[in-house]
Amino acid sequence: FEELKKYKSFTKEANNKFILSLGAGRCGQNWFAKIFNSHPNWIGTCERFSDFEAFFRYISFYNLPINKDGFFELFQLACNRDLAKYQNTIIASPYFAYGVEELFKKLDPNYLVFNLRNPVKSVESFYRKGWYLDFETEMNKNKKSPMINISNNLTRALSRIVPSEEFFNEWLSLTRIGKITWFWANTNKFIFDDFNKIKDVNKYFIKLEDINENYDFYKEMSIKFSFEKSISKKEFYNIINKAPNKGPLDKYEYKNWNNIEKKEFHSMIDKIFPYYDNIKTNI
């Protein structure tokens, strides 16, 4: 933080570009940021201050009366540093989802990117990561206030939110697939709603299945964002091959889900976020 404070007086110029990347998680944001980070005139980061970001998700989702100015200052300073040293920056995080409009007003990015991944692959990935595993259903019935879902680190404990108020007990009765699908659908809906409210900024939808291993897409990005020293197709694929953090559990694919899990999955999507198929990658 002391290093960042050196850039407090920095002023963004016309040739500085700042992208804010939003997503529900498991949607390729880390890889997307690495594409930018592969060029000398850009720096790309994802989950840069993960504990603070997870706390931001927690207090934003539960609408807790906690002043967020310190969080906004941290990211403004980080952005200033990036722009001063590298000219352009993309800051990505799945933890920004419940405060998009607020972040936009405070940080003033030049571009907003909404990273998405199809719901089946997303839920499979969250499941493999251990989301809502060993959740104490009986202990948590009828709770009226936000809880901490204890995990092996603070970031996960704060970020694995659960619904509050009247839907909570119904959510507890769902399978893990149902619980995870609620999270995916609800988080994307929050981003989608704020994304559509925001005007006078360049906004892009990016679907992972449209851009994954797509070098033509990279070439379009290279032009749009003025990448210096474009990378080769082989270098581009090497970025993809370094995707981290797949999760400790075995795969549990849609074809193996039982009928209850599939019913809950489709019900949650139809009820909360039925827009995915109609969204088009527009970069």
What would you call each of these model-derived segments?
Residues K129-S173:
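Acidic/polar short surface loop at catalytic or gating sites that assists cofactor/ion binding
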Residues G28-W42, L103, L107, Y127, ...:
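PAPS/PAP-binding and catalytic site of the sulfotransferase fold
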Residues F1-N15, L154-F205, D210-I283:
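PAPS-dependent sulfotransferases, especially Golgi type II membrane carbohydrate sulfotransferases
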Residues Q29-A33, D51-A54, A97-V100, V120-S125, ...:
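Short catalytic/ligand-binding loop motif for oxyanion handling, primarily in non-cytosolic enzymes
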Residues K106-Y127:
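Conserved phosphate-donor/acceptor-positioning beta-strand/loop module used by diverse small-molecule
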Residues D82-E102:
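Glycine-rich phosphate-binding loop used to anchor ATP phosphates in small-molecule kinases
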Residues F1-A84, Y132, A243, G247-P248:
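PAPS-dependent sulfotransferase catalytic core
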Residues L22-A24, I90-Y95, N115-R117, K207-E209:
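Short His-Asn-centered micro-motif
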